[in-house]
């Protein structure tokens, strides 16, 4: 089947094809995942998976027109810059730097809850993205306003930004409303800031041309589910002492690797699985850090501003530097030496790189080729080391530098 025949089935004229594939900034109509005709997916999906996708496409078929009309009506240079940069609040590096902050300021439990709701929101939204294989709003006609081309290569629904924003906003709502130390004027101010954060992040995904309404609503559902499950688990296990059970860290690591190696295979290349690996690694690293702390009775809780004064604000300088040193300097060499040199894992990374190098000149979105197994385990361990650094090592560094 030729490209002209394919896109004609999608309701695009030959003149439009020539415009959209023009040399000056044009791109292949099938460059982004999820835009192929139904036959492309039917032959590679189970009956239930394909029928689910077909049902949901009724909500995505016309999303590009809606998003394009919204952009035409509301775009301004200021809003472009505002929503482009505030989208970083849902980015990978933002979480790496910002999530540890409450720990260093004395609010350890807040970061713990945030890691759980964000980690499983990322995993579940990524799983459903790869299961449904639904497209983002088409560009063109939509303009994608983004700082990262990486995210444009993911499927659309559910929106991980929407899932994360919903989970975190519900968590803050819950904590603020139940707080015994905050007076109501302060609570109302904080709740207003949470609402502002939520609307900025969620509406920004539509404004930036990255998502349609199905993406946002399904993402919000994922985030709400993860929040309510977390609250239920905290209540159900409130008397559970993890330090008394040797199996707890082993189960956490085994569960994390199990759900990663049993993640659904997307039809087209989609990079969102990498974020799932990273966040599930962080969850397991948190579990192992908590287990060590409770089992051996280590007092690693950082003092708060009331008892330590303004020097608490110097902790992030030491903390962020420690995280960066682990993630960008030490981790890869240490982890892959452990896996390949000592544990004798088969290094299949070069096989995947070779495949991508051979096909990288193709303009059409590639079929999914799989992920290196040793890279899954390696990335899992690298990110498991981040909460270990934050929860176990940073308090020691703060003591050495008289910041604790």
UniProtKB/Swiss-Prot annotation:
Location within or outside the cell: Endoplasmic reticulum membrane
Membrane protein topology class: Multi-pass membrane protein
EC number: 3.1.3.-
Entry-linked InterPro entries: P_Acid_Pase_2/haloperoxi_sf (IPR036938), P_Acid_Pase_2/haloperoxidase (IPR000326)
Any Pfam family the entry gives: PAP2
Glycosylation sites: 62
Stretches of the chain found on the membrane's Lumenal side: 1-86, 135-154, 204-215, 263-319, 401-404
Residue ranges annotated as Cytoplasmic topological domain: 108-113, 177-182, 237-241, 341-379
Region (Phosphatase sequence motif III): 204-215
Site features described as Stabilizes the active site histidine for nucleophilic attack, chain residue numbers: 215
Main location per the UniProt record: endoplasmic reticulum
Annotated catalysed reactions: sphinganine 1-phosphate + H2O = sphinganine + phosphate
Positions of region (Phosphatase sequence motif I): 129-137
GO biological process: phospholipid dephosphorylation; sphingolipid biosynthetic process
One GO CC term, this protein: endoplasmic reticulum membrane
Molecular functions (GO terms): dihydrosphingosine-1-phosphate phosphatase activity; sphingosine-1-phosphate phosphatase activity
Catalytic residues as annotated in Swiss-Prot or TrEMBL: 161, 211
Residue ranges that the Swiss-Prot or TrEMBL entry lists as coiled coil: none
Region annotation (Phosphatase sequence motif II) ranges: 158-161
Known function: Dihydrosphingosine 1-phosphate phosphatase required for efficient ceramide synthesis from exogenous sphingoid bases. Involved in endocytosis and calcium-mediated signaling.
Family (UniProt): Belongs to the type 2 lipid phosphate phosphatase family.
PANTHER family, A to Z: DIHYDROSPHINGOSINE 1-PHOSPHATE PHOSPHATASE LCB3-RELATED (PTHR14969:SF28), SPHINGOSINE-1-PHOSPHATE PHOSPHOHYDROLASE (PTHR14969)
Protein name: Dihydrosphingosine 1-phosphate phosphatase YSR3
Organism encoding this protein: Saccharomyces cerevisiae (strain ATCC 204508 / S288c) (Baker's yeast)
Gene: YSR3
